[in-house]
From Swiss-Prot:
Protein name: Orotate phosphoribosyltransferase
Involved pathway(s): Pyrimidine metabolism; UMP biosynthesis via de novo pathway; UMP from orotate: step 1/2
Top EC group: transferase
Keyword Transferase applies: yes
Species: Methanospirillum hungatei JF-1 (strain ATCC 27890 / DSM 864 / NBRC 100397 / JF-1)
Gene that encodes it: pyrE
Amino acid sequence: MVTATLREMLISAEAIRFGDFTLASGKKSTVYIDIKKAITSPAILKKIAAEVLTHSTDFDAVAGVAVGGVPLAVSVSLASDKPYVIIRKEQKGHGLASLIIGDVAGKRILLVEDVTTSGGSAVFGIEQLRSAGAVVTDVIAVVDRNEGAGKTLQGLDITLTPLVRMQDLING
C-alpha cells in the first residue's frame, strides 16, 4: 500500500483555497491555506505528527498557539509521549491569568504552527515561552507561505522548518 504524502493529503482535504482573503498577518492574498479544517481529519493529524518527529525529537515538550497550533501540539505530544503546552493569545478575564498552560521553565520547547506567513504568531509564542523560562530554538510549520517568516525567526535565533511550502501545494 502506498502512503499518501502530506502534500497530497492537504490537497485532498481542500486545504488550499483561491479567492480574495485577508490573512492573520493582515496581508491580502489570493490563496488561503486552511490547515484548521484539514486537521479535523485524524489521518492528517497523525501524518503531521509523524512528519514533525522526522525533523525533531530533541525537545522536552511541544507547544502550540491557540487555536490552530493546539491540535498540532496534542498530536505531536501523543506521538512522542511528551507533554504539550498551550499558548493563549490573550489573558482570560477569570480563573488563572497565565497565557501559558503547561510547565515550560528550563525546558526545551518545540513550537508547532499551522501556517507561517510573516511569522507574527510564532514570534508571539516564542516571546511568551521565553518569558516563562523556556528554551526555544525551533519552529515547525505545517505550511510556510515563504513570505518572511523564516527571516523573521532567524532574527530570534530560531530555525523554521516547514513540512510543506505553499508553492509545492500550488505547483506540485
